[in-house]
Amino acid sequence: MSELKYKRVLLKLSGEALAGENKFGIDPATVSKICHEIADVVDMGLQVALVIGGGNIFRGLSSSAKGMDRSSADYMGMLATVLNALAVQDALEKLGHPTRVLSAITMQEVCEPYIRRRAERHLEKGRVVICAAGTGNPYFTTDTAAALRGMELKCEAIIKATKVDGVYDKDPMKHDDAVLFPRLTYVETLQRKLGVMDSTAITLAMENEVPIIVCNMFKGSIKRVVCGEEVGTIVQGG
């Protein structure tokens, strides 16, 4: 068994990732594939907290631009993340991994309320913790929620798993000559506006000196990252 570099990480997934080849909704086959990647690292003893976006169901920011009240749109987006969290919970538990969904918006018939100490106890017991409903406040993205939960739960790294292999100078899905950045500082990421995470999330990680690693959600990349291999892009340092 490979030795783990980290004991506890925060894994951020976009909602769009769950849609697979579709542009909308939840694709069960894709969710299962992602959960196999997560299960591989949990089997190694890694403690995993998850934050999942809701963009495959509802994106508050784009809808507010069409005239909807921003707060209402953001709350709808938060509820979308709960749907995604329940889908991932179901898939992980089918693989034999106890999983708890903790929501920043109370809905006691569906999931537990997010309480930091409770989340930490679940992690210590080897359960996967899915933090749903963002921060529970409008105007904050799920990127910011991921950074916040990562700090609260004392995670040693934030891993952002995406459809591409890391951070590029331009969109690699559209440009064959896109160049991958193996390493970036927090300040470089902010100045270049590379879209790794939003500025609030990056600043929070920078202030608390928690590295952000951007990698492919498949190809065994998450496992390679937690074992200490230099995969994708690592954002750290001044």
From Swiss-Prot:
Q: Which GO terms describe its cellular component?
A: cytoplasm
What pathway or pathways are given for this protein in its record?
Answer: Pyrimidine metabolism; CTP biosynthesis via de novo pathway; UDP from UMP (UMPK route): step 1/1
Give the chief site where it resides: cytoplasm
What is one Gene Ontology biological process annotated in the Swiss-Prot or TrEMBL record? UDP biosynthetic process
Q: Where does UMP bind?
A: G54, D74, T135, G136, N137, P138, Y139, F140, T141, T142
- Activity regulation as described: Inhibited by UTP.
Q: Which GO terms describe its molecular function?
A: ATP binding; UMP kinase activity
**Keyword hit for Nucleotide-binding:** yes
- Keywords from the named record: ATP-binding, Cytoplasm, Kinase, Nucleotide-binding, Pyrimidine biosynthesis, Transferase
Q: Which residues bind ATP?
A: K12, L13, S14, G15, G55, R59, T162, Y168, D171
What InterPro entries does this protein map onto? AceGlu_kinase-like_sf, Asp/Glu/Uridylate_kinase, Uridylate_kinase, Uridylate_kinase_bac
- EC numbers listed for it are 2.7.4.22
Q: According to its UniProt record, which reaction does this protein catalyse?
A: UMP + ATP = UDP + ADP
Work out whether the entry's keyword set contains Magnesium. no
Cellular localisation: Cytoplasm
Top-level class of the enzyme under EC nomenclature: transferase
Q: Which domain of life is it from?
A: Bacteria
Tell me the HAMAP family matching this sequence.
PyrH_B
> Whom does it interact with, and what assembly results?
Homohexamer.
Task: Write out the function statement from the record.
Answer: Catalyzes the reversible phosphorylation of UMP to UDP.
Stored NCBIfam families: pyrH_bact
State the similarity comment: Belongs to the UMP kinase family.
Write the protein's name.
Answer: Uridylate kinase
Q: Which organism is it from?
A: Nitratidesulfovibrio vulgaris (strain ATCC 29579 / DSM 644 / CCUG 34227 / NCIMB 8303 / VKM B-1760 / Hildenborough)
